[in-house]
Amino acid sequence: MKLTVIGSWGGYPKADGASSGYLLEHEGFHLLIDCGSGVLSKMQNFFQPEELDALIISHYHPDHIADIGVLQHARLIQSFLGRKTDTLPIYGHSLDQHEFAKFTYKDITKGVCYDPDSTLSAGPFQIRFLKTNHPVPCYAMRIEADGKTLIYTADTSYKEELAVFSENADLLVCECNFYGHQNGKNAGHMTSLDAGTLASKANVKNLLLTHLPHYGELRKLKEEASTKYTGPISIADYQWSHTF
C-alpha cells in the first residue's frame, strides 16, 4: 500500500498548493481520497486523472470536493481524444442529496452511496467508517488491504471513539488544523496535541499531520504532537509518500 499526498492545506490551498487530496495505491488500483481545490492540477505532475479507479469523499465542504467538477471534465475530454475511460465511481454519503447528486455526470462518473455502518469494498481495499465531530456530516475511514491499515480522520474535533477506530494502524493521516494552545472543538478540528494523543492512544506506527493551518510555524505542530506521541511524525507536504 502506498499513500501520496497531493494536497494538505485546510480551508483553501496556498499559492501553488492544494487542499485535501491523497492518492492511495495497491495492486495497481488507484483510489483518490478527497478532491479539494488544486488537487487535479497538482496530481497531473505525476499521475493522470483518467488513470484513477475510484474516488471517495469524506464530506462535502469545498476544500474536499472543489475539484470534482474539473476532474469530470478532464475524463470527458480525454474520452473525446480517444482515451478510453470506464465510468469512475465516486463514493460518498447520502446525507446531503444536493451535493451527492453532482457525483454522477453523463457516463463519466457515477455517485455511489456508501453505508457508514457497513464495510465498503473498493478494488483491493476494505473501508470502514466512523462519523466525526464536524459542522457537516463527515466520516473518518479505516482502509485495509493485505494486513495493512491506513486511517484517515478527515475533519473532526477529538473524540475518544477515534482511538479504538484507529487502533494499531500502520499510518494515521490525522487532521491538525490548530496549534496546541488553541481550541478546535467548536470548529470541528483537532490541535497538534489532539493528534499526538490520538496516535498514542491508538498505538499507531506512524503519524502524518495534515489539513494544515495557513499561519504560524508548521514545525511546531510536529514538536507539540511529539509531547504526546513518541513514534515517527511527519508533516504532510506535496508528494510526500509512504509505502507500507
Feature locations, PLM:
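Conserved beta-strand hairpin/beta-sheet module of binuclear metal-dependent hydrolase folds
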Residues: 1-47, 138-154, 171
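Divalent metal-coordination and catalytic microenvironments
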Residues: 3, 22, 34, 43, ...
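Active-site neighborhood of phospho(di)ester-bond hydrolases with catalytic His/Asp-centered motifs
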Residues: 32-36, 53-59, 63, 93, ...
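Active-site metal-binding motif and surrounding structural segment of the metallo-beta-lactamase
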Residues: 38-87
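Metal-dependent catalytic neighborhoods of phosphoester/phosphodiester hydrolases
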Residues: 67-75, 102, 217-225
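Catalytic core of the metallo-beta-lactamase
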Residues: 112-168
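Cap/insert and terminal regions of metallo-dependent hydrolase folds
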Residues: 158-241
